[in-house]
A protein has these predicted regions:
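A conserved mid-protein helix/loop that constitutes part of the nucleotide-sugar donor-binding site
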Residues: 20, 199-222
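Membrane-proximal helix-turn-helix segments that form the acceptor-binding/catalytic region
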Residues: 79, 106, 130-147, 245
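Conserved acidic donor-binding segment of nucleotide-sugar-dependent glycosyltransferases
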Residues: 313-322, 328-333
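Aromatic "clamp/platform" in nucleotide-sugar-dependent glycosyltransferases that forms part
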Residues: 279
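A short, active-site helix/loop in glycosyltransferases that binds the activated sugar's phosphate group
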Residues: 141-169, 173-180
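Short His-centered aromatic/hydrophobic patch
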Residues: 92-97
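Short hydrophobic beta-strand element within catalytic cores of glycosyltransferases
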Residues: 292, 296-299
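Nucleotide-activated donor-binding/catalytic signature segment of Leloir-type glycosyltransferases, i.e.
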Residues: 242-262
C-alpha cells in the first residue's frame, strides 16, 4: 500500500502540531509494512529528496506566504503525486488542503483526510479565509474516502453536521510519547535560560494569536509568583503579533525559540507546570507531551483541551487572565495530579498508527465510492 501525505510543512523537527503528528505516525506505519511518501514544502526542508526513518520525503516548491502557501503547495503536490509518485492513497492533513480532495479523486486516487481542528476559528483569518476553510472541511468530508478526526468532541459535531457521511468519520487522536516519560537530567536544561528544576512555568507553540500566549504573559505579570515563564517556539512568519509578544521579554519572561531533543524533554520534565492558554486546538500534542513527562498542566477550557479529561483544577476559562493568574499564584494548592500510565495507554502512538493503517487498508477490501 503506497500512501502520499500532503498538507504538512515537512518532517522531521519542523515546528507544528501536524508536523509532530506526522513525524510520529508515518515511521510506525512504514514499520507495519506501508510505503509512505511525504511531499514537504520547500521553505521548511533543506534537501530536495531524503528519507526519514523509512519515510520518503520529497520537497515541492511553494511560495512562503501566510495565506497562499498551503493552498498553492497542496495543488502542486497533488499533481506531482499523480505524475511522479503514483500512490494508492493521498492522505491530506487539515481542512485547508482538504479543499483539494475532489481534485485528487478526479485524478483517480483514493483520499483520506485527517481533520486536525476547526482552523476557521483561528484569529488570524478574515471572513473570506474562514469561508474557504469551512468549504475545505466540507470537501474533505464529502469527497474523502475516510475522515480521521483528532478530537472527540469535533468528531461528534462533524457526524451531526454531515449525517450522510457519518459512517466514514472516525475518531483517531494524537498520541503521547513514552520517551517523554523517562528520566532526563536537569543538566540538559538550556544554560542560557538560567532556569532550574521546578522554578519555571512552561508553554510551547508557535507565536500566533490563537495560542493565547499574550494572555499568559498578562496573567503571569499579575501573578504573585517567584517562578519564571519560559515560552518555547517561534513564528513561521514574523508579523506584528509575534514582534509585539517578543518585546515582552525580560529577566523573568524568557523566549527560548525553537527547541528539540533532550533540551525540550528536559524543559517539559523539570517545569513546575505546563500552561496552554489556546483559543484553538485540534488535540494539543504539546499538552500530551507534558502529561507524558509527568508535569502538571493548566489548560484553557476549549473543547479540544477538555477532551483530554484532565482534573477540574487544570482548566481555566479561555481568555480569563484573572483566573489563570490566580491559578499560577496558588499553583501548590491545586489538585492537578493525573494517571500518567493510563494516559500513555489511551494516547499510544503505536496503537494510533495501527488503527490508521487498518482504516486505510479497509478501503481496498470493499468497493468504496
Amino acid at each position: 500500500m503506497k500512501i502520499c501525505a500532503i498538507g504538512l510543512r515537512g518532517i522531521p523537527d519542523v515546528m507544528g502540531g501536524i508536523e509532530s503528528h506526522c513525524q510520529q505516525l508515518y515511521p510506525r506505519m512504514v514499520k507495519n509494512g506501508a510505503s509512505v511518501t511525504v511531499i514537504a514544502r520547500s521553505p521548511y526542508v533543506k534537501q530536495k529528496k531524503y528519507t526519514f526513518e523509512g519515510v520518503n520525503v520529497l520537497s515541492v516548491w511553494t511560495l512562503k506566504h501566510k495565506f497562499l502557501e498551503t493552498f498553492m503547495h497542496t495543488f502542486f503536490a497533488i499533481i506531482y503525486a499523480r505524475i511522479f509518485v503514483h500512490p494508492d492513497v493521498i492522505h491530506l492533513h487539515a481542512i485547508g488542503p482538504a479543499l483539494f480532495a475532489p481534485l485528487a479523486r478526479l485524478l483517480g486516487m483514493k483520499v483520506v483526510v485527517t481533520h486536525h481542528g476547526a482552523d476557521y476559528d483561528r484569529q488570524k483569518w478574515n471572513g473570506f479565509a474562514k469561508f474557504i476553510l469551512k468549504l475545505g472541511e466540507k470537501m474533505g468530508v464529502v469527497f474523502g474516502n475516510k475522515v480521521f478526526v483528532v478530537g472527540k468532541t469535533l468528531t461528534e459535531r462533524l457526524k451531526q453536521q454531515f449525517p450522510d457521511h457519518a459512517d466514514k468519520i472516525v475518531y483517531v487522536p494524537n498520541g503521547m510519547l513514552p520517551s517523554f516519560s523517562g528520566d532526563i537530567s536537569s543538566d540538559y536544561l538550556p544554560q542560557e535560560l538560567s532556569v532550574s528544576p521546578q522554578n519555571y512555568v512552561l508553554t510551547v507553540g508557535r507565536l500566533v494569536p490563537e495560542k493565547g500566549f499574550h494572555d499568559l504573559v498578562v496573567a503571569y505579570k499579575k501573578a504573585n509568583t517567584g517562578l519564571k515563564l519560559v515560552i518555547v517556539g517561534d513564528a513561521d512568519h514574523r508579523d506584528e503579533y509575534s514582534v509585539t509578544l517578543l518585546k515582552q521579554a525580560n529577566d523573568d519572561i524568557l523566549f527560548a525559540g525553537r527547541r528539540g531533543g533532550d533540551e525540550l524533554k528536559a524543559l517539559f520534565k523539570h517545569a513546575k507546570v505546563f500552561i496552554l492558554p489556546s483559543y484553538h486546538e485540534g488535540l494539543p500534542i504539546v499538552a500530551l507531551e507534558a502529561i507524558s513527562a509527568g508535569t502538571n498542566v493548566l489548560l484553557s477550557d476549549i473543547a479540544p483541551n477538555l477532551d483530554i479529561e484532565a482534573p477540574t483544577d487544570s482548566y481555566f476559562p479561555v481568555g480569563d487572565t484573572g483566573s489563570l493568574s490566580n491559578k499560577i499564584t496558588n499553583i501548590d494548592s491545586l489538585s492537578l495530579g493525573m494517571d500518567q500510565a493510563g494516559f500513555l495507554q489511551k494516547f499510544n502512538w503505536d496503537r494510533i498508527a495501527q488503527s490508521t493503517q487498518d482504516y486505510i487498508s479497509a478501503l481496498f477490501d470493499k468497493k468504496v465510492n
